[in-house]
Amino acid sequence: MPLRHWGMARGSKPVGDGAQPMAAMGGLKVLLHWAGPGGGEPWVTFSESSLTAEEVCIHIAHKVGITPPCFNLFALFDAQAQVWLPPNHILEIPRDASLMLYFRIRFYFRNWHGMNPREPAVYRCGPPGTEASSDQTAQGMQLLDPASFEYLFEQGKHEFVNDVASLWELSTEEEIHHFKNESLGMAFLHLCHLALRHGIPLEEVAKKTSFKDCIPRSFRRHIRQHSALTRLRLRNVFRRFLRDFQPGRLSQQMVMVKYLATLERLAPRFGTERVPVCHLRLLAQAEGEPCYIRDSGVAPTDPGPESAAGPPTHEVLVTGTGGIQWWPVEEEVNKEEGSSGSSGRNPQASLFGKKAKAHKAVGQPADRPREPLWAYFCDFRDITHVVLKEHCVSIHRQDNKCLELSLPSRAAALSFVSLVDGYFRLTADSSHYLCHEVAPPRLVMSIRDGIHGPLLEPFVQAKLRPEDGLYLIHWSTSHPYRLILTVAQRSQAPDGMQSLRLRKFPIEQQDGAFVLEGWGRSFPSVRELGAALQGCLLRAGDDCFSLRRCCLPQPGETSNLIIMRGARASPRTLNLSQLSFHRVDQKEITQLSHLGQGTRTNVYEGRLRVEGSGDPEEGKMDDEDPLVPGRDRGQELRVVLKVLDPSHHDIALAFYETASLMSQVSHTHLAFVHGVCVRGPENIMVTEYVEHGPLDVWLRRERGHVPMAWKMVVAQQLASALSYLENKNLVHGNVCGRNILLARLGLAEGTSPFIKLSDPGVGLGALSREERVERIPWLAPECLPGGANSLSTAMDKWGFGATLLEICFDGEAPLQSRSPSEKEHFYQRQHRLPEPSCPQLATLTSQCLTYEPTQRPSFRTILRDLTRLQPHNLADVLTVNPDSPASDPTVFHKRYLKKIRDLGEGHFGKVSLYCYDPTNDGTGEMVAVKALKADCGPQHRSGWKQEIDILRTLYHEHIIKYKGCCEDQGEKSLQLVMEYVPLGSLRDYLPRHSIGLAQLLLFAQQICEGMAYLHAQHYIHRDLAARNVLLDNDRLVKIGDFGLAKAVPEGHEYYRVREDGDSPVFWYAPECLKEYKFYYASDVWSFGVTLYELLTHCDSSQSPPTKFLELIGIAQGQMTVLRLTELLERGERLPRPDKCPCEVYHLMKNCWETEASFRPTFENLIPILKTVHEKYQGQAPSVFSVC
């Protein structure tokens, strides 16, 4: 919520119709917006000398009737310090002092009510196996319980009357008129709610409560400036409206929903936090930036304590539905803030003060400030961990990008981190916290003791269903201080079906101990209680329940505690059952020296020849000699050739599966796989060459000379790569020192090491038991017997723990001197591996190396805890000049772009795969680079810049991500750098893979979602086709190629094209061909053609050009366009694809309506395609209903 209003309105009413109390002489007083269904004083007092903020929130929530699943939406606000308190903040109050705080909803999600169809629906995750309700309002109501809903309404009223939307911020007469009308409507809803709540006529309420008490303060002051006659006329008009209004069936709840929905529209700042920061920097480890290291001195990237007193340089916006965004504050705004005495803490408050003064001086509203152009950083699900050092905050993203912030004070930094952490727990993982400094005490206890949050019964049932004897302990959904032990029992129904019956046993807290109902023993912790119950039988009447294994919370699991935003996404898991990798021709590789042996492979250094563009200087460094003669015909890359021994042809499939896995992932700390080459009987995996080779070899060579700080940076990078794989539910399976390749040494001052995790080699399932034993201690114990069930991300956590020991011990892994039988015996007896001398590091490794897979921490947890493992003498190792200018991560330099291969061509441009390697040492990331063809004219170059300007403003899951630009001033060229999507376009992918109808319909739905977003930004694509839809994985597509995209002018319905050039006419609607007009509906026509392509699996013999040319006959140039236009106007359309269901072809034909206004919008198409997708999901092709 915006913070500025508390400073302005400390004497105002925290509850709409209750007076604010004076502070007590001693103790803590927490003011409320709503005192609960029974009423009472709008505050709660505490006399305890020491409490945590979480304890206070839980006590108040219980008092007013808020249920445990909604606890995490609330927090305490300190109006005097203008900060929110993190949940672990300890409130120590002397008896002779007093403290006043506010209990408020802090975590807010716009459109939770579902009243705005233009915004994503928000709802709690539904039970497993169910789909979300189509009623968005019903979805939203699941977010809040009745008490939270009442509290939000009262808090919203308080925000509104205290100018969360101010009249003085508006500039045009139209805006001011709209604001006044909406405010009077809000006042009416306010009075209507009072009438319905008290059961009295609306006119009676209006006599007791003036409408001026229900409108913003700025509006009230504006009314006071009018004459008495004008004020009387306004009052009479409002009363007449109240008298004539017939409420009908308008319920109290609907009034409240309408009030809050209108408040969202009128006040975009409602439910958001805009945090001023004194310093902001974006970092990318790929550029050689050092990691953020915890130490006793100033952090390397810490701008220093003096910056905390300066004015804000940036603002960070945090919203529940929009994630984290930022923008630079203009110097003029900073000067105004400094002169207003706000000390940079609250720029909006000072800005408001200046406007008020200006208004009093001239009697007119001041010009509204320019709305900031927010730069998107990430969603909460993309965050791996957050580091807090004094007043400096570092937010780390899944792709290794980092946002560094310096806030005005330590309290402001804690407030900000607790905000990000709270949203993360609400949207990504309810059983994980991002930063130790703001960790909720109850969650810390729950993680330590294996306690689930307040789960609803369907989620409990789903967790206990897999096997008999499972049980779990979770917090009650109705009582904040009660735990529930739930156990399941299968029973045989008369019809032969098995049913799962749950039995719940309450666990009460008594004097700091935990007692299971019906059992006289007490335990100091839930963990000890659970350990005592392991293997026991619980009797309840005639029933007997066996407790065999406790079901522990797992990373990122879905439950009613997770809030979904937008359409329910399909799991982003890669399809590993289908092989997908680049085929390398044997003529493109040259085998050089032998490097050693791997598991059933021989490893060679090699050269991979990649096709060049004919430019002899392309890809050449300034100080680099040509690799080979004839560089103008291409270039050669240094690679590693892993040759599978021909005698092991029986495991070639497992070898291919490894190549396929590594070809479908892209991360800066994963070694790149170029593809597979079949050379006679040999199968060769062609992988990236990394300069300094295996880490374990290098560590042993440098024994005793590698500082611990260096090793911890390497450990963080390895954990980052494994966290990326875990997030995709992928298993590496062979994490060890020899598979970590050292790309940069990072021993020089101001540099850091850089590693890449290599491919795992031959899959674990193809190895013999002897080969698996050889991999001890890196192989997880559960994997030793073999079998598909043993493969899980938990095995990578064990491998990481063993590798961490290997790194700490300078490349010497434990148990290497033992015989195979001794290694097996070690695992069978569940012995512990040796631990490092550092206690914190020993704790982390022991957690990774526990024999129970479900108890191993997630890689998010590992990354978070690694930041606390740094020794106190690291400041001198990674010192960075804070005054050095920050590099712009969106600016790419040509000399660092190394071409790998061409990816495809469009009408005017060419897309290639490059490795961006600014340090020239193998640490680059794979990017897709688009450049104009050399023969393009000025018009095309102008359109090219427009394409870049469009793409850099877009951010959507189903639109290709913009990374930056590469500009060459000498050649006057501009290249667009985008994310690399490994699987390529649908046009190339579908003919080579067997994709079912349901999956094709999912792709179509995602295309509609991306196009709906594009249209909402007032752009038309003009080139939507299967060739321009890219496949990230087998469940996710992204729209690319915006070369023909145009911005629709404000107030217009179409864009008229005037330039000549090649156009994809067979995808164009009649109005485009005939009148050169492109409506939003013209993209819908193109979508219909794209859907046709999908249903034909992009068969070239069934392509739109082929089919249309069959209908119109032989023609050239404009005659083709003319005949095509006549054909379409006669009602001729593309035929129904083979095995295309009737309703899908009917949908295509709706998109092909001749009249643009008759075509559906993409917003209309999304729910239709979702329904059709759900219908055919899981059905065999034979049951599809075709015409």
UniProtKB/Swiss-Prot annotation:
<feature type="modified residue" description="Phosphotyrosine">
    <location>
        <position position="1055"/>
    </location>
</feature>
<dbReference type="InterPro" id="IPR008266">
    <property type="entry name" value="Tyr_kinase_AS"/>
</dbReference>
<feature type="modified residue" description="Phosphotyrosine">
    <location>
        <position position="292"/>
    </location>
</feature>
<dbReference type="GO" id="GO:0005737">
    <property type="term" value="C:cytoplasm"/>
</dbReference>
<dbReference type="GO" id="GO:0051142">
    <property type="term" value="P:positive regulation of NK T cell proliferation"/>
</dbReference>
<dbReference type="InterPro" id="IPR036860">
    <property type="entry name" value="SH2_dom_sf"/>
</dbReference>
<dbReference type="Pfam" id="PF18377">
    <property type="entry name" value="FERM_F2"/>
</dbReference>
<dbReference type="GO" id="GO:0038155">
    <property type="term" value="P:interleukin-23-mediated signaling pathway"/>
</dbReference>
<feature type="region of interest" description="Disordered">
    <location>
        <begin position="335"/>
        <end position="366"/>
    </location>
</feature>
<protein>
    <recommendedName>
        <fullName>Non-receptor tyrosine-protein kinase TYK2</fullName>
        <ecNumber>2.7.10.2</ecNumber>
    </recommendedName>
</protein>
<feature type="compositionally biased region" description="Polar residues">
    <location>
        <begin position="339"/>
        <end position="349"/>
    </location>
</feature>
<dbReference type="GO" id="GO:0072536">
    <property type="term" value="C:interleukin-23 receptor complex"/>
</dbReference>
<dbReference type="InterPro" id="IPR041381">
    <property type="entry name" value="JAK1-3/TYK2_PHL_dom"/>
</dbReference>
<dbReference type="GO" id="GO:0005524">
    <property type="term" value="F:ATP binding"/>
</dbReference>
<dbReference type="Pfam" id="PF21990">
    <property type="entry name" value="SH2_1"/>
</dbReference>
<dbReference type="InterPro" id="IPR011009">
    <property type="entry name" value="Kinase-like_dom_sf"/>
</dbReference>
<dbReference type="InterPro" id="IPR016045">
    <property type="entry name" value="Tyr_kinase_non-rcpt_TYK2_N"/>
</dbReference>
<dbReference type="GO" id="GO:0009898">
    <property type="term" value="C:cytoplasmic side of plasma membrane"/>
</dbReference>
<dbReference type="InterPro" id="IPR000980">
    <property type="entry name" value="SH2"/>
</dbReference>
<feature type="region of interest" description="Disordered">
    <location>
        <begin position="610"/>
        <end position="629"/>
    </location>
</feature>
<dbReference type="InterPro" id="IPR000299">
    <property type="entry name" value="FERM_domain"/>
</dbReference>
<dbReference type="GO" id="GO:0060333">
    <property type="term" value="P:type II interferon-mediated signaling pathway"/>
</dbReference>
<dbReference type="InterPro" id="IPR051286">
    <property type="entry name" value="JAK"/>
</dbReference>
<dbReference type="GO" id="GO:0005829">
    <property type="term" value="C:cytosol"/>
</dbReference>
<feature type="compositionally biased region" description="Acidic residues">
    <location>
        <begin position="614"/>
        <end position="626"/>
    </location>
</feature>
<feature type="modified residue" description="Phosphoserine">
    <location>
        <position position="499"/>
    </location>
</feature>
<dbReference type="GO" id="GO:0035722">
    <property type="term" value="P:interleukin-12-mediated signaling pathway"/>
</dbReference>
<dbReference type="GO" id="GO:0005856">
    <property type="term" value="C:cytoskeleton"/>
</dbReference>
<feature type="modified residue" description="Phosphoserine">
    <location>
        <position position="884"/>
    </location>
</feature>
<dbReference type="GO" id="GO:0043235">
    <property type="term" value="C:receptor complex"/>
</dbReference>
<dbReference type="InterPro" id="IPR035963">
    <property type="entry name" value="FERM_2"/>
</dbReference>
<dbReference type="GO" id="GO:0006955">
    <property type="term" value="P:immune response"/>
</dbReference>
<dbReference type="GO" id="GO:0030154">
    <property type="term" value="P:cell differentiation"/>
</dbReference>
<feature type="binding site">
    <location>
        <position position="930"/>
    </location>
    <ligand>
        <name>ATP</name>
    </ligand>
</feature>
<comment type="similarity">
    <text>Belongs to the protein kinase superfamily. Tyr protein kinase family. JAK subfamily.</text>
</comment>
<feature type="active site" description="Proton acceptor">
    <location>
        <position position="1023"/>
    </location>
</feature>
<keyword id="KW-0677">Repeat</keyword>
<keyword id="KW-0597">Phosphoprotein</keyword>
<feature type="domain" description="Protein kinase 1">
    <location>
        <begin position="589"/>
        <end position="875"/>
    </location>
</feature>
<keyword id="KW-0418">Kinase</keyword>
<dbReference type="GO" id="GO:0031234">
    <property type="term" value="C:extrinsic component of cytoplasmic side of plasma membrane"/>
</dbReference>
<dbReference type="GO" id="GO:0008283">
    <property type="term" value="P:cell population proliferation"/>
</dbReference>
